[in-house]
Design a protein with these regions (language model features):
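Conserved small/polar residues in nucleotide/adenosyl-binding loops
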Residues: 346-348
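Bacterial Sec-dependent N-terminal signal peptides
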Residues: 1-27
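Extended extracellular/luminal ectodomain segments enriched in beta-structured repeat modules
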Residues: 79-88, 270-280
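Ser/Thr/Pro-rich, low-complexity mucin-like regions
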Residues: 183-248
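Short coil-to-beta strand junction motifs in C2/discoidin
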Residues: 98-104, 290-301
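Short beta-strands within extracellular/lumenal beta-sheet-rich domains
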Residues: 64-76, 258-269
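Short amphipathic, basic-aromatic surface patches that mediate peripheral association
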Residues: 92-96, 282-292
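Short strand-turn-strand beta-turns centered on an Asx-Gly dipeptide
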Residues: 299-311
Length: 348
């Protein structure tokens, strides 16, 4: 039994490999590279008059949850025998929402009986949590028949990129600083997610959540690129992914402010034979109210079995370099945490 302690809003997963039998050398078939355009400028919005809590797949296979604020789709990948590299690409543009919003690209864990989809359908519910440890923070840690949603990437939407980016826009045309030549039309983030491939292999449900409360919302695109090894004997290692915690409030959950009051502790088991174990940590520093860490330096600490393994302050002082993605906002002069508007959040 291992003990994990956190003091920051986050998504965490453990990835590890199991020992392989090197003696069983053989030539493996090539299945080729795979490119999947999961979403292509798909609206992410808040339209309770059009989308109920659960909207079945449309002609493009897109499922919508929580009144359109989550888009979800089933993907299928070849049954690769050789090792692969996996890259995720997410592109977002405003469709009329001019504000900065938190966003999450995720996959539903296959081993979880309870997930966002059947919760939205009203068929299941998040399991109860120990209120002495987690207060009312349902859905953030594993429970009976439940594994937290596995986050692939987290991001912050820019202020109005795309919708307000034209040269003659009444809002932004007079706000462009002299040091940028133009407003960008969208923002794109790219992330290596090879370690998380086991959650995607064969079939999986992947999605994007944006915390928008407007009918216009955003348009989002998502691409997956899987590159197969060219080495004929490069066998796919036995990787495993274990989602430990996810504090994104996807559906009917509480805003994750528990870290302002206490450290969060959870138990997890690690196989004795596991090798190359990695702790994947994604931190969000957004929300400046009541001592929030958007403009205040807050230390992020992770401990395993009482031993500190991570201690840092997510912080940047080059806000101006992202100004071109934010036509619907004013001048940026103040250093901020990792939640730069138009920046993918810190992945460790």
């Amino acid at each position: 039994m291992n003990l994990l302690t956190f003091i920051a809003p986050l998504a965490v997963a453990a990835t590890f490999m199991m020992p392989a039998d090197a003696a069983n050398h053989k030539e493996l078939p090539a299945l080729g590279n795979t490119h999947i355009q999961v979403f292509d400028k798909t609206p992410v919005c808040f339209r309770p008059d059009s989308f109920p809590n659960y909207t079945p797949a449309n002609a493009d296979g897109v499922i919508r949850l929580v009144n359109g604020r989550i888009i979800l789709k089933k993907i299928t990948l070849p049954d690769y025998k050789r090792d692969v590299d996996v890259t995720l690409k997410v592109t977002v543009a405003s469709n009329g929402d001019r504000w900065d919003k938190s966003g999450s690209c995720f996959v539903l864990p296959k081993e979880s009986v309870i997930n966002l989809m059947n919760i939205a359908e009203g068929k299941r519910a998040f399991p109860a949590v120990d209120s002495t440890k987690y207060e009312k923070m349902i859905g953030i840690v594993p429970g009976q028949d439940y594994v937290p949603t596995l986050e692939l990437m987290r991001f912050m939407t820019p202020f109005g990129v795309g919708y307000y980016s034209s040269d003659n826009d009444s809002l932004s045309s007079k706000r462009r600083p002299v040091y940028i030549p133009k407003w960008e039309k969208s923002v794109t983030w790219v992330q290596d997610i090879t370690d998380l491939y086991p959650a995607l292999e064969r079939e999986a449900y992947v999605g994007i959540y944006i915390d928008t409360w407007t009918a216009e919302g955003y348009v989002a695109s998502m691409e997956l690129d899987v590159k197969e090894s060219k080495i004929t004997c490069d066998v796919m290692p036995e990787r495993r992914v274990k989602p430990l915690m996810n504090t994104v409030y996807y559906i009917g959950q509480t805003y994750p402010d528990i870290f302002s009051r206490k450290d969060v502790v959870m138990d997890f088991d690690m196989p004795k034979a596991a090798k190359n174990v990695r702790l994947k940590y994604i931190v969000t520093g957004h929300g400046g109210h009541s001592g929030g860490d958007e403009f205040v330096e807050k230390r992020n600490i992770v401990s395993v079995d009482g031993k500190e393994v991570l201690n840092f302050i997510p912080w940047r002082d080059d806000c101006a370099s992202f100004r071109r993605f934010n036509p619907a906002t004013g001048v940026w002069l103040i250093p901020r945490v990792a939640a730069y508007i138009g920046l993918s959040l810190i992945h460790i």
